[in-house]
From Swiss-Prot:
NCBIfam families recorded: rplT_bact (TIGR01032)
Biological process terms in GO annotation: ribosomal large subunit assembly; translation
UniProt function note: Binds directly to 23S ribosomal RNA and is necessary for the in vitro assembly process of the 50S ribosomal subunit. It is not involved in the protein synthesizing functions of that subunit.
Protein name: Large ribosomal subunit protein bL20c
Species this protein is from: Gnetum parvifolium
Annotated compartments: Plastid, Chloroplast
Pfam families documented for this protein: Ribosomal_L20
Disulfide pattern: none
Length: 115
């Protein structure tokens, strides 16, 4: 059987993974086997945390809207129900920005929705 010299291809594959892991600490950035495992873990964590970030921001927006709506004597769920009843659709991100930046406008808006 003939000898297969695949140094370039193998080296390119290893260098690609080691370059990805270059910011990791200790042997996680130096040794190929460890770096390969850490790259796998890093990509899994990155995907998980991207999904978690969406949940966290939604919770933050709801908390901000709820805090602003409480001044009008409503709860968040009542506010959303009033918006649904009046056929108003606005996403939570925009509502939270309005609630934090334009508080007087948001309070009059929530009062109008209530009636």
């Amino acid at each position: 059987m003939t000898r297969v010299k695949r140094g370039f291809i193998a080296r390119r594959r290893r260098n690609k993974i080691l370059t990805f892991a270059s910011g990791f600490q200790g042997s996680h950035s130096k040794q190929f086997r460890v770096a390969k495992q850490q790259k796998k873990r890093a990509l899994i964590s990155a995907e998980r945390d991207r999904m978690k970030r969406k949940r966290d921001f939604r919770r933050l927006w709801i908390a901000r809207i709820n805090a602003a709506v409480r001044f009008s004597g409503l709860s968040y769920s009542q506010f959303v129900y009033c918006m649904y009843k009046n056929r108003l659709s606005q996403n939570r991100k925009n509502l939270a920005q309005i609630a934090t930046l334009c508080t007087p406008f948001f309070s009059t808006f929530s009062q109008k929705i209530m009636t």
